Amino acid sequence: MGGASIWHWIVVGVIVMLLFGRGKVSELMGDVAKGIKAFKKGMADEDQPQAPVVAAPPVTATEPVRTLPPHPTEPAPATHATVDRKVV
């Protein structure tokens, strides 16, 4: 009682097949196999030394940088016309 015999596993397998169907179980196992292969490939790639990264040479400007003239410190004169009104 309490031990997992072969008959227990057969019953569990039959219940899983009835619940999920044959197509879902095989699809799930295929996805698990792909995941294991990807993991192994990633571990193998990690062990290999990687080529050193070569930095690109700095880009130099072909035109000199232009500067803006300084802002005037005095306020500009008013350009709008004033209207003379008579106060009655």
UniProtKB/Swiss-Prot annotation:
Region entry Disordered: which residue ranges?
Answer: 62-88
- Pfam families linked: TatA_B_E (PF02416)
Q: Please give the superkingdom of this protein's source.
A: Bacteria
What topology in the membrane does the UniProt record assign? Answer: Single-pass membrane protein
Localisation: Cell inner membrane
Cellular compartments per GO CC = TAT protein transport complex
- The transmembrane segments are 1-21
| Alphabetized InterPro entries for the sequence | TatA/B/E (IPR003369), TatA/E (IPR006312)
Name the family the entry cites.
Answer: Belongs to the TatA/E family.
Quote the function comment for this protein: Part of the twin-arginine translocation (Tat) system that transports large folded proteins containing a characteristic twin-arginine motif in their signal peptide across membranes. TatA could form the protein-conducting channel of the Tat system.
Cited PANTHER family: SEC-INDEPENDENT PROTEIN TRANSLOCASE PROTEIN TATA
Listed name of the protein: Sec-independent protein translocase protein TatA
Species per Swiss-Prot/TrEMBL record = Methylobacterium sp. (strain 4-46)
Q: What are the leading ranks of the lineage?
A: Bacteria, Pseudomonadati, Pseudomonadota, Alphaproteobacteria, Hyphomicrobiales
Q: Which gene encodes it?
A: tatA
